[in-house]
């Protein structure tokens, strides 16, 4: 397996609007697209449960994106915020490997299943966060573009 450049940063925040304001006014990063993708995420099977409750803001840079995530209900993001506080949650790397290859390789390294695995209602994979927290200090987002 070979990972390339970082193409996505997922950051958990307590207050989405306040975080966006800091990025825009003090860091010069913007504009942001703010969304409340609740309906979309509620339909998913997320690590054996139903949906995710979040609000999100996206910045699309030159070859990378930053996602700010504000948890609005119980789930993995709220758990993260309570346990670790706001900050970097996950990274996504450019790769030519398939979704399954990356998931399998990360499981072989850690001995653990993904921290999160979101699937469409029909069971097809959408996204996973490989848990390499102990081994490499990070969660790796793995997107599935396979039909």
PLM segments and residue spans:
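Histidine- and/or cysteine-centered catalytic micro-motif in compact active-site loops
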Residues: 37, 71-73
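A structural feature that tracks compact, well-ordered secondary-structure segments
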Residues: 10, 69-71, 141-145
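Short, basic, helix/turn surface patches
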Residues: 58-65, 140-147
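Basic/polar N-terminal segments that are highly enriched at the extreme N-terminus
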Residues: 1-2, 147
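Short, charged/polar, Gly/Pro-enriched secondary-structure boundary elements
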Residues: 77, 134-139
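Core segments of cupin and vicinal oxygen chelate
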Residues: 12-62, 101-125, 131-134
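Vicinal oxygen chelate
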Residues: 6-14, 56-64, 73, 80-99
